[in-house]
Amino acid sequence: MSHHPDLSVSLDQLLLRKEVRVRQQGEWLKRHSLPLVSFTVNMPGAVKLNAASQTVMDAGMRAIQELCQKTGWRQVACQLLVEKTGPEAFVVIQAPSASMLKKAMMKIEREHPLGRLMDLDVIDVDGHIISRQGAQLPRRRCLLCERDAVICARSRRHSVEALLAKIEEMTHDYSCCA
C-alpha cells in the first residue's frame, strides 16, 4: 500500500474531523427526524484515504442499499464525503426502529467479507449512538488474532504494517471475487 506523505493525517486532524462529523450528524438528525447511519472505515496508520478505504466504503454502501431493497426500508437521504481523514457517509434510513437498524448494520459488519473494516454507527433521533453492547452484541474481534480488537489496539499488539498487509489482502481478495 503506497503512503503518500500529503495524505498522512495527525491525531489533531482526526479529532477535529470527528468534532465536525458530530455537528453534521446533529444537523442531519434535526433535518430528517429519522435514525442516521454514520459510516466510517476502520483504517490503521496515518494514511486514512487510500484504495483500500475506498473499496471498503464502496462495498459498504452497496451492502446498505441491498439491505434497504431486501427489507423494504427506505433510504431517505445519503451523502458521501471523501476526506483526507478517510471516506465517510451519512445515510438516513426509514426503519421500524433505530435498534433494528443497528442490528442490521452489525449484521453487515459481521457477515460482509469487508465488514470488519466498516464502522456503521447508528444514531437515534435523540442523538444517542446505539452501541454494540446496548444491542447485546459482542465487541469486535482483532483482524489478526481474533482477540478483542480494542485490547489489541490499545496495547499495540500488532504493527500497523501487519494490519495494513491484512487489509490489503482482504480488499484485494474482495475486489477479485466480487
UniProtKB/Swiss-Prot annotation:
Gene Ontology molecular functions: holo-citrate lyase synthase activity
Catalyzed chemical reaction(s): apo-[citrate lyase ACP] + 2'-(5''-triphospho-alpha-D-ribosyl)-3'-dephospho-CoA = holo-[citrate lyase ACP] + diphosphate
Key word rRNA-binding present: no
The keyword Nucleotidyltransferase appears for this protein: yes
EC number: 2.7.7.61
Residue pairs linked by disulfide bridges in the UniProt entry: none
GO biological process: prosthetic group biosynthetic process
Alphabetically ordered keywords of this record: Nucleotidyltransferase, Transferase
Family: Belongs to the CitX family.
Function description: Transfers 2-(5''-triphosphoribosyl)-3'-dephosphocoenzyme-A on a serine residue to the apo-acyl carrier protein (gamma chain) of the citrate lyase to yield holo-acyl carrier protein.
Name used for this protein in its record: Probable apo-citrate lyase phosphoribosyl-dephospho-CoA transferase
Lineage start: Bacteria, Pseudomonadati, Pseudomonadota, Gammaproteobacteria, Vibrionales
